[in-house]
């Protein structure tokens, strides 16, 4: 799901691999899906606007693409663009879309201008262009960390808040090597320092060095951060700390959002996450996999989970479903 959402967002950057891959991509669990389009339906908020984006693609072509907008609490609503087959409608709020022809394999998201004079179009374009994605393999090589002093200090302070003694970092180019090396400065209790290269760090530290800059950028922009297997190789307390950054209004004044996958039940706790923030995935016998929020799940007694239940314990006991059948 996260990969699919990321590929939709990449359309705004001109990466149309989602569309071109539809020639060979379909749900292999059901042969009838071979004849159906890949369909996406996104609801999101940005700068006071509520947007709905719909996309259907099949065999390397866009069949239908729509963007609707509205302002909650007002009558301000309309269409940014609507496209079906060869019919195309561009709304007044879409701003100038600079194209003479629109190939079937190209998304209209590519032509939304983040610098548009239309606040509505600008909000929609910036949401897509600022989405970030952290994947499990991203920390296998040294990340491209910011060199600006202020950003560097923010990253190091967050690492120190997680009890990691990294005081600073530098990027050096060694003779005979094409790629620059990332060197971390560690502080010792006696006030002395020592230096460690990125490749010498533990897997957990390497993951945090790759993840935390994305967290900082997400909080600064108020953007969506997607993270696959966020809990892997991280201590549960570190995972909780990262979640707390998004839940604290002072640290997250621009309403950034974190959507992640995890197998760690330690965060399934009312003190950490609300019921509507927890989605479980299960595959009922004989049917396709389903994703459902804990806030709408009905237990055997017909009641939804209370907001004071020990979610993690109840989940492991099989009270909420979504456990593997072993």
Residue ranges and their predicted role:
Residues 51-175:
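Electropositive, glycine-dotted interaction segments
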Residues 240, 244-326:
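C-terminal lobe/lid and adjacent interdomain/linker elements of RecA-like ASCE P-loop ATPase modules
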Residues 40-45, 184-186:
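Short beta-strand segments that buttress and anchor functional surface loops
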Residues 174-216, 220, 224-237:
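Conserved ABC ATPase signature
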Residues 1-26, 208-209, 214, 244-245, ...:
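Phosphate-binding glycine-rich loops of NTP-binding sites
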């Amino acid at each position: 799901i996260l990969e699919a959402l990321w590929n939709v967002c990449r359309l705004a950057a001109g990466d149309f691999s989602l569309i071109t891959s539809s020639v060979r991509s379909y749900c292999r669990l059901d042969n009838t899906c071979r004849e159906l389009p890949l369909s996406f339906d996104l609801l999101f908020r940005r700068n006071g606007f509520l947007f709905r984006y719909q996309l259907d693609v099949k065999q390397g072509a866009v069949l239908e693409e729509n963007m609707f907008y509205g302002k909650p609490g007002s009558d301000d609503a309309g269409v940014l663009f609507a496209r079906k087959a060869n019919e195309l409608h561009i709304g007044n709020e879409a701003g100038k879309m600079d194209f003479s022809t629109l190939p079937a394999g190209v998304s209209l998201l590519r032509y939304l201008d983040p610098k548009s004079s239309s606040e509505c179009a600008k909000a929609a374009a910036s949401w897509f262009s600022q989405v970030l994605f952290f994947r499990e393999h991203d920390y296998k090589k040294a990340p491209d960390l910011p060199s600006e002093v202020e950003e560097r200090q923010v990253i190091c302070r967050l690492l120190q808040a997680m009890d990691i003694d990294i005081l600073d970092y530098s990027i050096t180019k060694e003779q005979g090597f094409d790629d620059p090396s990332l060197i971390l400065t560690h502080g010792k209790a006696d006030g002395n320092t020592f230096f460690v290269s990125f490749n010498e760090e533990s897997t957990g530290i390497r993951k945090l060095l790759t993840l935390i800059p994305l967290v900082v950028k997400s909080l600064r922009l108020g953007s969506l951060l997607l993270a696959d297997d966020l809990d892997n190789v991280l201590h549960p307390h570190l995972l909780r700390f990262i979640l707390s950054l998004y839940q604290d209004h002072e640290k997250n004044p621009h309403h950034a959002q974190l959507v992640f996958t995890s197998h760690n039940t330690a965060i399934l706790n009312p003190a950490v996450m609300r019921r509507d923030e927890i989605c479980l995935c299960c595959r009922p016998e004989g049917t396709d996999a389903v994703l459902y929020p804990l806030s709408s799940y009905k237990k055997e007694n017909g009641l939804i989970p209370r907001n004071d239940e020990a979610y993690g314990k109840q989940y492991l006991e099989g009270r909420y479903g979504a456990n593997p059948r072993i």
